[in-house]
Amino acid sequence: MGRIITLLIVFLASIASKSLANTPNQDTDVKGKVVNQDNQPVASASVYLMSASANVLIKSAVTDDQGNYVIIKAPKGSYYIEVTSVGYSQGKSAVFELGDNTYQVEDIKLTSSSQAIEAVTVQGQLPLVQNVNGKLVLNVENSAVAAGNNALEVIKRAPGVSVDKDDNLQLMGQQGVNVTIDGRQTFMTGDQLANFLKSTDGSQIKSVEVSTTRTAKDDAEGAVGTINIVLKKNRTEGFNGTFVASAAHGKYPRGNTSLNLNYKKNNTTLFGSYGYTNEKQLNELDLDREIENAGVTKYFSQKADMLEKSQNHNYRVGIEQKTSEMNTMLFQVSGNNYMEDSENSSVTNIGFTPTSVDTILRSPTTADMGLKRMSLNFNNEYKIDTLGAKLTLDLDWSMFKNRSNMDYRYRTENPSGNLFYPEELERSNMPTDIDIYVGKLDYVKPFKKGTLEAGLKYSNVKSDNNMLFEKMEDDVWENVLTRSNHFVYTEQISAGYLDYSKAFGKWNAKVGVRAEYTISDGHSITADTKVKRDYLDFFPSVNIGYNMNENHVLSLSYAKKVSRPNYRFLNPFRYYIDKLTYQLGNPYVNPQYTHGFTLNYTLKQMFNFTLGTDITNDAMVESMGQDAETNTTWVTRENLGKSLTSYLNMNIPLRVGNVWSMNNNITGIYMHFKGPIAGYEIDQGSFFVQANSMHTFKFSPQWSAEAAINGNTPFVYNLFKIHARIGVDVGATYNFKDQKSSLKLAVTDAFRSNRNNLSTDFHEFQSKIRQYHDNQTVRLTYTYKFGNLKQQIRKKDSNNEEKDRAAN
């Protein structure tokens, strides 16, 4: 692996040494002016650079007080300019060819509209999926299918993203995804992350960015890549807001509502939002198991219906202050309060043949859970000069308080309903407190022939989990010491990075290294044991790009990444899922390190193809075990063997006529694992396909419709065979003529086919799992915009146009 890294760096250096200092850059600027019919400048008009061949939006800008605009660093090609402004009809330039020199567009004259409206419909709106700076971006702001859903449901629709039976996010078929919000790390994985995303209002999301590569500036966490959730931001002058109300019905009714407010005057912007969700849903689980003991096989057939009722309040409030022409400050507070009550009616039939029943285990469980989250963020961006040098400071504090109380009742009966043993009563109380402190400083310095980026970051995480488990003995609750546990985990990461990028002719390159020093301490207070670690890691990254012309762009990248275990996986404790199944913590499980290689090809600025390979040694995998004496099954995490995953992701947008546009994302994945699992050596590979096809039909300015189809073919993942899955979502949108309100109707999982079915057939491990979340719903969402709805005025960093376009 070190040899490959060395070859990449040598290749980069050889290219740089052969480059001529005076080689012209491929990217050039487009300038122009927008005037009205009296030749007076039109300020704050939105200007769009459109590809003439593909008719898609490439870049954007806003005119200044004199009506002038500059679109910087546009690649060579054929384009035209499209202009919109409040009170004017749409303007358009002639098609022009952009070469090596700055192009001056003839003045575009706008005529007053006889039916001036307060908002303008932009014909060059962002496509549903686009490739921005090597990231696949899902734009969901106006999606009927995504409207009214939570963040987890929105993310599931992003290219290359899937969710397993436990709601763990996967990217290109792999776990180990780093989820960020507006570029800030959440520091959560597993069920903590899933519950957090379920409690996050999807109507606050503008887009979802998916990336399988990283630079030295990015956190090394996330072995397979990063999913960044970009929240909506509105910086329109004056007062404005948006009200959203959504009602849905699955097995039971559910609904949510939200209010977003924004006020901007001169250099001060105040913003805030509040959302409320009330849901009731039924999740179904069927589990069949076989356990052999002394040549005798027992069959267990479990059916569980889990009724969940939840409420969630989420909020965000903040202020952005431009203190000078060179400095901007931002302070915001966000959080949510999530409450859930659940009832699990589980029945397990036990017999010595698959059809006979000798024993029935009834284990109804009730639970109430609460999750409180609060985050404070301070950001200060100082522009050192007008050439792009800047210094950015980020300070974050986040607090999570998770409360979970469960009551268990076990009845072991014969088929006639008579008890074999006295009824058992148990209960648990599991509070978890997490505090996260993060400080980050980033510096950017452009030079004549390149750009230097450097930064420092410090994070401190403390997780305190105090599990109390009790059992009723002689009408008195007694503490079960073997199942109670107090575990405190602290982790400090100090990081620094250097990145240098350079463009020479048709070539560009970025090389960097990130260092992370980690100190961790896992302390089981109950067992009086500690596992301390401290280690220094270096994470190199290299990216080499070649812009052949506007139709052909290639890039090759390498990065070393890491996935750290969930805090709960490190807790040396048995976490019981039911009486016969538990998760076993492993305090000695180590982070896994992944070497990722990607080759990316973009055709005609539309079609994107990514070929990638991830190699992981000492892979952190899920292992299983069984106790034939007690009929229990346990699951744990261990560092076992080596995994290799190769994938080809193809993102293909197409347009059929003027009405129908689609985006097809197809990923072919090969996963191979070699190593011991559950006491047996495995050396196996599996190929499968994930696909997501989204279709938009624009019938008129008022009417549009959507359809989304997603699924995967069968594949093998460690001990599990994952069965094929398919889901179909449809929706329609009606925009009222006042341009302020809209109505969206959506049907999710229209054919009730989006199921999680899997099985194991591995030596003594024989099981079948059939799982269905309450996915099939009909949802109606109403949106109303009020206040000043004029075009948003945005002053953008001249070196980051496309990123701003995707993130604002």
Predicted regions and their residues:
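Short, acidic Ser/Thr/Gly-rich low-complexity loop/linker segments typical of extracellular
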Residues: 52-68
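Face-selective signature of the C-terminal outer-membrane beta-barrel domain
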Residues: 3, 314-338, 365-523, 547, ...
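Surface-exposed extracellular loop regions of Gram-negative outer-membrane beta-barrel proteins
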Residues: 519-521, 550-596, 611-630, 750-763
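Outer-membrane beta-barrel signature, preferentially recognizing the C-terminal barrel domain
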Residues: 485-491, 562-610, 615, 635-646, ...
